[in-house]
Amino acid sequence: MIKIILAQPRGFCAGVIRAIEIVDQALDRVGAPVYVRHEIVHNRHVVDTLKAKGAVFVEELSEVPPGEVTVFSAHGVARTVQKEAEERGLPVVDATCPLVNKVHAQGRRYLSHGRTLILIGHAGHPEIEGTLGQIDGPVHLVGSAEQVDSLDIPSDTPVAFITQTTLSVDDTRSVIAALRKKFTDVIGPDTSDICYATQNRQAAVRDLCKQSDLILVVGSPNSSNSNRLREIGLEEGLPSYLIADGSEIDPVWFEGINTVGLTAGASAPEELVQSVITAIRALGPVTVEQLDGVEEKIAFRLPPTLRHLKARNAAHNNLDNKTAASEEADSLSNDTEQEA
């Protein structure tokens, strides 16, 4: 008999739910195709489901035909991308997570106060590329305490830091500690820039590890937050695997295993978790229980540009992208509200 213990919380966060809903509603209002720059979230199942509905995923705006509705992914984009869309007159709906937008605003504010800005994150991640491109000024990217030590910046320089939202909480704390050790004047948000969902899921996996012999994380290989969950299991000394769904289960993993801890990254839908449970059931008898944990009631408002898409479709007029972008900026403070 294998016991499966489910982490709580797990799976979709508010930013992912919002991003998927934006694409769904855009398709409902204007019909296919709707173009999406980059994967809307890092999960192949989600992307394939939206493709089947008529979403077309591209990496560059040059791949978008003139006049076609375009959605920016939850990870955010550089200002140059926004400008290119405006110059081409593309109707844009920005699905950037409000918590990522918050990081952009913090970075700009720190620079405006004359501080040297340090961004903690993983080079090459779409969120990092977007953040670097949203801040008009020099930004020093570091991903580890060792990289902090190699920064060629005088120790008495006033510095500020911001962070990628999907980092390991513990790793980020070590980088922040290195910054405070190297510089005499450091300000920043501690780990509060790491989003609530990332922190909650990491804490839940740590609790899961205390009761499990094996950790399974449902998520895609390019999902930063999913990889961090697997790393926590490994750090706790448990065999830990990142899998897309139940089809990737290997029976060998369960030899001598009594209790399996099961969780999912913030971009993985619950149906994939259930597919893993089904696959384990095929190996023999199982019981399933769920840990007590944080109940997430956060939701983010959809951007007002979706309403413009509906009006544009009804009147057969072109969306004024400049006006939409202005309204989006004006509503940023409202978009970032966390609602129960």
UniProtKB/Swiss-Prot annotation:
Catalyzes the conversion of 1-hydroxy-2-methyl-2-(E)-butenyl 4-diphosphate (HMBPP) into a mixture of isopentenyl diphosphate (IPP) and dimethylallyl diphosphate (DMAPP). Acts in the terminal step of the DOXP/MEP pathway for isoprenoid precursor biosynthesis. [4Fe-4S] cluster binds at C13, C97, C195. Pfam families: LYTB. The keyword Iron-sulfur applies. The gene is ispH. Pathway: Isoprenoid biosynthesis; dimethylallyl diphosphate biosynthesis; dimethylallyl diphosphate from (2E)-4-hydroxy-3-methylbutenyl diphosphate: step 1/1; Isoprenoid biosynthesis; isopentenyl diphosphate biosynthesis via DXP pathway; isopentenyl diphosphate from 1-deoxy-D-xylulose 5-phosphate: step 6/6. Its cofactor is [4Fe-4S] cluster. It is an enzyme of class 1 (oxidoreductase). Its EC number is 1.17.7.4. The lineage of its organism: Bacteria, Pseudomonadati, Pseudomonadota, Alphaproteobacteria, Sphingomonadales. This is 4-hydroxy-3-methylbut-2-enyl diphosphate reductase. It comes from Zymomonas mobilis subsp. mobilis (strain ATCC 31821 / ZM4 / CP4). GO terms for molecular function: 4 iron, 4 sulfur cluster binding; 4-hydroxy-3-methylbut-2-enyl diphosphate reductase activity; metal ion binding. Binds 1 [4Fe-4S] cluster per subunit. Dimethylallyl diphosphate binds at H42, H75, H125, S223, S224, N225, S267. Isopentenyl diphosphate binds at H42, H75, H125, S223, S224, N225, S267. Disulfide bonds: none annotated. (2E)-4-hydroxy-3-methylbut-2-enyl diphosphate binds at H42, H75, H125, T165, S223, S224, N225, S267. Residues 317-340 are annotated as: Disordered. Keywords: 4Fe-4S, Iron, Iron-sulfur, Isoprene biosynthesis, Metal-binding, Oxidoreductase.
